[in-house]
Structure formats: C-alpha cells, structure tokens
Amino acid sequence: MELRVGNRYRLGRKIGSGSFGDIYLGTDIAAAEEVAIKLECVKTKHPQLHIESKIYKMMQGGVGIPTIKWCGAEGDYNVMVMELLGPSLEDLFNFCSRKFSLKTVLLLADQMISRIEYIHSKNFIHRDVKPDNFLMGLGKKGNLVYIIDFGLAKKYRDARTHQHIPYRENKNLTGTARYASINTHLGIEQSRRDDLESLGYVLMYFNLGSLPWQGLKAATKRQKYERISEKKMSTPIEVLCKGYPSEFATYLNFCRSLRFDDKPDYSYLRQLFRNLFHRQGFSYDYVFDWNMLKFGANRAAEDAERERREREERLRHPRNPAARGLPSTASGRLRGTQEVTPSTPLTPTSHTANTSPRPVSGMERERKVSMRLHRGAPVNVSSSDLTGRQETSRMSTSQIPSRVASSGLPSTVHR
C-alpha cells in the first residue's frame, strides 16, 4: 500500500532517526524528485518538530540553510518535508579513514564559520555544532556545506531590540559533550561564543582523527560528562593543537576569551584561516579529500575493467588491430541508481591542471557516472561565501562510493 504525506509526497524507506523523530526517503510526486521526510509522533512527550520547522522557516534564504517544502500533520504524525542532501561530514570523515588534509579542513572551516554567523544573525544559537549536523550538497551544490538540525537551537536575543538573554548558571548540558564548550560543561547559559568554540573542537577532531576526551569510561552519563569536562579543562589549547598551524590555537583562544554577550568577530576568524590557506599555496578549487579518493578509485576500477575487456577482445579477434586499446564505455546500471552528467567539469582547468591525478583523455570516461541516493536534508545556497571557483571540482559529493552514500543517516542526526 502506498503511503502519502500532504497528498503529494510518497513515503519510502527509513533512512535515519534521532531523538526527536525519524527520517524517511520520499518522493515529490508532482516534481518527480526525491525528498527527505521527517516524522514525529504527535503523542510524543515533548514535541519538537513544529518548533524546529518554525526556526527553519525563519532561516530560509541563507547560504547552506535547508529548504523546507512542506510542514503539517498527517494522521498520528507531525511532518516536515525537506529537499534531499548528501552525506554528513562525519560520514565523509569515516570514508576518508578518519583524517582530513589541512586543505580540506580549511575549506570546511571557511564555510562552517559562515553558517554559524548566519544563524546568529537571525537571533539564534545552534547549540549542537558537530560533524553530523553539517551536510554536503548534491549535484551542482556538491561543494557547499549545509547546516541542519535546529532541534536544540535557542533564541539568544530579541529580534527587534537585540536585547541579549541574561547570564545564568546551573544549566544542564545541552548538545554533544564531545564538542561542548568549557562554559557549557560548567553549567553556564550558552551564547554565540559557545557555538564557535564547539566548531574549534570539530576542526581539531578533523585534524587529529579523535579528541583527547574521547573513549573515557564511566558508570553513568553524568560521570562521563564530568570526566570529559575534566579532561577538556586540563588539556591546554597549545597541547591540543600541537603539531598543527598556530591558527587553530589562536582560534580557540579567541573563542574562549569572549564574554557572554560579546559579538564574535567572524570576519577575523575566517581571515585567520584564509591567510593560512594562501600561505600553504592551496587553491580554491573545492576539491575535497573525498573527491580525490573517489577519483582514484574510479580510475583503478576502470583501468582493471579496460584491461580485462582488451584481453577478451584480443582473444576473440587476435588479428584485429582495432581491438587493442578499446575504451571501456559499456557499464551495467545498478538497480536504484540513475545516470547523470556531473555539473562540475571533469577536465582540468588552468588552476586545477597541476593537481589532476590522471590524464585528460581518461576523464571523458567519467562523464557518465552512477549516483546513489543519499541521506536526507535540504538545499538552499548562494555563492556569497565562496571566495574561489566552486565549479571546478572533478567529482561531486554525489559520486562517493555506495558504502557512504547508501549508509543512511546516523542515529544521532536530525533530532
């Protein structure tokens, strides 16, 4: 039996869950495109989806803010329909063997600071900054970072007067302990500074592969939070960032120096990392680590397949010279995939030619690739925070291998 939502969206398989609801793959029947559908039982003790959808609507139009297609109630469920996005940074981090290059970390940092700045400009703090809550776009938007999950977001100032909320103590920890700011651990009301400090820990997580306070054992959740807090406070920033450019320590020291109601200097923090990016000689080609890994994997698989076909062809036509070097153009389509032509160029341009891992002639065989369905979330983007050329990535996020693409949403995503 076909299940429909809002008389327009066909409900498909479950692709994720969170503490505030489950996420399903869906189809917009009128537009013939996939969407993400978030469901929350109306009988839940503390309904959150309606509040979250209202925050999403207030954020609409911003760079990297998910587009909401429909909200309402259907039977016993509150429903929010959003456009479909690609994998989270946590998914991609695992795909890249839990280590990002400095270039990738800096490309991400630039966009992530901008996402947080935008949310703050709309009078909210996110309060759950972590890799799971940043997703990459699909297709033409494959180089852009999106921020999701406003289930824990809170208004920190009055929209009209900009009067800041009062300083409070003895607050319970809200968010994810691994990335929580020290003040959050101490029970202090969160403000803008805490979102940015959390981002600093996320960036060092990407650099290091793990944080010193991961994997601590404790009998209860409260005791574990206390152990994480103790380890975090006893680890000097310079020790945490040892072996990495000083900008990361400078960033964290700046965030920790902010007072409760201070407005952070987002431009200064962005410029800190942009200057490092340029000093390292990196190019704003928006080729991330996962693009390069997939590119190499495609090349190896294609080369092996081409050699196999050439051997078979030579055996069938040993005297036919045209049989040698036959390109491998035939490919069986996988069930549940669609062939697309990537929007990003697959041939090197003047600023990417030096980094191309394969010759131009081989790239033509990449023009048609299989795109698997990815985890749900929405899309809305502008190029205002991209200082480089976003259309030069050789492979888009939508082309990462199925072990990431089809993995679905982690259980901690999309509360």
Curated annotation (Swiss-Prot):
This is Casein kinase I isoform delta. GO terms for molecular function: ATP binding; protein kinase activity; protein serine kinase activity; protein serine/threonine kinase activity. Monomer. Interacts with per1 and per2. Component of the circadian core oscillator. One of its GO terms (biological process) is Wnt signaling pathway. It is an enzyme of class 2 (transferase). Residues 341-352 have a biased composition (Low complexity). Casein kinases are operationally defined by their preferential utilization of acidic proteins such as caseins as substrates. Central component of the circadian clock. May act as a negative regulator of circadian rhythmicity by phosphorylating per1 and per2, which may lead to their degradation. Participates in wnt signaling. ATP binds at residues 15-23, 38. Residues 380-415 have a biased composition (Polar residues). It is found in: Cytoplasm; Nucleus. Keywords: ATP-binding, Cytoplasm, Kinase, Nucleotide-binding, Nucleus, Serine/threonine-protein kinase, Transferase, Wnt signaling pathway. Pfam families: Pkinase (PF00069). Residues 317-342 are annotated as: Autoinhibitory. SUPFAM superfamilies: Protein kinase-like (PK-like) (SSF56112). It comes from the Eukaryota. GO terms for cellular component: cytoplasm; nucleus. Its EC number is 2.7.11.1, 2.7.11.26. It comes from Xenopus tropicalis.
